[in-house]
Amino acid sequence: MDIQEEYMPFRAYQTYYRVVGDLRSPLTPLLLLHGGPGSTHNYFEAFDQLAMATGRPIVMYDQLGCGRSSIPTDPHLWQAATWVAELRALRAYLKLDCVHLLGQSWGGMLALIYLCDDQPRGIQSVILASTLSSAHLWAREQHRLIQFMSTTDQAAIHQAEMTGDFTTPAYLAANERFMIQHATGPITEQTPEFLRRSKRLGTAAYTTAWGPNEYFPTGTLRDYDYTAKLAQLPYPTLVTSGVNDLCTPLVAKTMVDQLPHAEWTLFPHSRHMAFIDEPAAYQARLTQWLAAHDEVTDD
């Protein structure tokens, strides 16, 4: 399977992208939007197996501010409009006239902003993976999950939120336990190489756009709420999430209830990255979904 790694000029910067397979394939490409902001494409290399098994081309990229893309120092860049413009530019640059669009976590937010505000053509289907339509609901659900932690961890998190100091050992340990429970990790020798590989995280992009952690949005995305806009989306949409996900069943169902053409698959043994926690089951469901919607066209 051919893998092409190149750079796209974007404004005064460069965006790294990675294409697995042949974009001339009769199968519609799958375009992947990673989370964060600032988490890089690396974990999406799990989808290389899908490309190899089906022949479907897959496109992934590092959004501006992380990974192998440029990491500017201008904090004003870290807002949704920048990444939407980059997504538009990438589709045009690679001539991705028709795509299946998958966004995970923040990538799903980016997808929803793009779809609702731009109403783009050529979207065969949408996959919203462990994402959200409301920052307020997300924060509320994370704090509900925190209530199931030890009283010591709850106190450390509460203290950090009250003081704005997210550097204490007690808080850092509590946050790590929370993320292992609901997101990803720990990293071991058995962890796939693409997850163990060092990467340039977009820390500035994350903290400026979202906040200090998953449950305390304070950045430019803090008022994000597209729930009421979901009803206008005409695209077939698959929502995926895990039972132990940051994207709780309430967060996922809130989207499903508003989307007019949605299906929801809840993975019973997964956290925030079901394609990592249950790769075979996720690949099977996604392969089925993509094949079923390849013939849908944007008239």
UniProtKB/Swiss-Prot annotation:
One BP term from GO: proteolysis
InterPro entries membership: AB_hydrolase_1 (IPR000073), AB_hydrolase_fold (IPR029058), AB_hydrolase_sf (IPR050266), Peptidase_S33 (IPR002410), Pro_imino_pep (IPR005945)
Active site residues of this protein: S105, D245, H272
Top-level taxonomic group: Bacteria
Cellular compartment(s): Cell envelope
Species the sequence originates in: Levilactobacillus brevis (strain ATCC 367 / BCRC 12310 / CIP 105137 / JCM 1170 / LMG 11437 / NCIMB 947 / NCTC 947) (Lactobacillus brevis)
Task of the protein: Releases the N-terminal proline from various substrates.
Alphabetical UniProt keywords: Aminopeptidase, Hydrolase, Protease
Chief location of this protein within or outside the cell: other
SUPFAM superfamilies: alpha/beta-Hydrolases
Gene Ontology MF annotations: aminopeptidase activity
Catalytic activity: Release of N-terminal proline from a peptide
GO CC, any one term: cell envelope
Protein name according to UniProt: Proline iminopeptidase
EC id: 3.4.11.5
Keyword Hydrolase attached: yes
The AB hydrolase-1 domain, residue ranges: 29-279
